[in-house]
Design a protein with these regions (language model features):
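Nuclease catalytic cores that cleave nucleic-acid phosphodiester bonds
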Residues: 2-11, 15-184
């Protein structure tokens, strides 16, 4: 049986941070570098968890104004993270990634609320999701995972149910004022 190709998830990093409801703390005009870095790390972790085994994922951040940005990707938790090269916008990188994926007939989803990117990639036949839609999906993903870990049947856990039966017998005997438990 042939191995099924993974789908490609492309995330417009800064757009999602500024537009997704999960990351609203970044839109505060008084955000600090620390707050922004925490939000970026949260997004990266969210993409890692959302992508799981079904998606190959890449997050593209805009590095156009950074003279030192090379456009090289780094992999964290199976997700490729890149800043666009100096002088090139993240939008152009995302459009090229989406176009190339469709040329290879790879099912692709682009997460952005940027209307221009949405229109461009939709023209390539690529699926799209808004930043807020992604925020909701991630929230539901975490909620489903949390529910999967909860016991399905209510179970009463008492100290007596977890203690060695011989020790329990001795404790009962002491409680009842007996010097030795019955049966000895």
């Amino acid at each position: 049986m042939a191995r099924q190709r993974k789908k490609l998830l492309i995330v417009d990093g800064y757009n999602v941070l500024r537009s997704g409801s999960r990351y609203r703390q970044v839109t505060d005009p008084d955000y600090t570098d620390d707050t922004f870095n925490v939000a970026r790390e949260t997004l990266i972790n969210d993409v890692i968890n959302y992508a799981g085994r079904d998606w190959r994922a890449i997050i593209v951040f805009d590095g156009a104004r950074n003279a030192f940005s090379t456009g090289e990707a780094e992999t964290v938790g199976g997700v490729r993270i890149m800043f666009s090269p100096a002088g090139q916008s993240a939008d152009k990188v995302i459009e090229k990634l989406a176009h190339d994926a469709r040329e290879r007939q790879v099912e692709t989803l682009v997460v952005t609320s940027d209307a221009t990117i949405q229109d461009t990639v939709f023209g390539f036949g690529v699926d799209r999701m808004s930043a807020d839609g992604f925020s909701r999906e991630v929230g539901m993903h975490y909620e489903d995972a949390r529910l999967d870990e909860t016991p399905k049947v209510a179970q009463k856990n008492t100290v007596a149910s977890r203690i060695d039966p011989a020790v329990l017998a001795k404790l009962k005997a002491m409680r009842d004022g007996e010097s030795e438990p019955h049966g000895r």
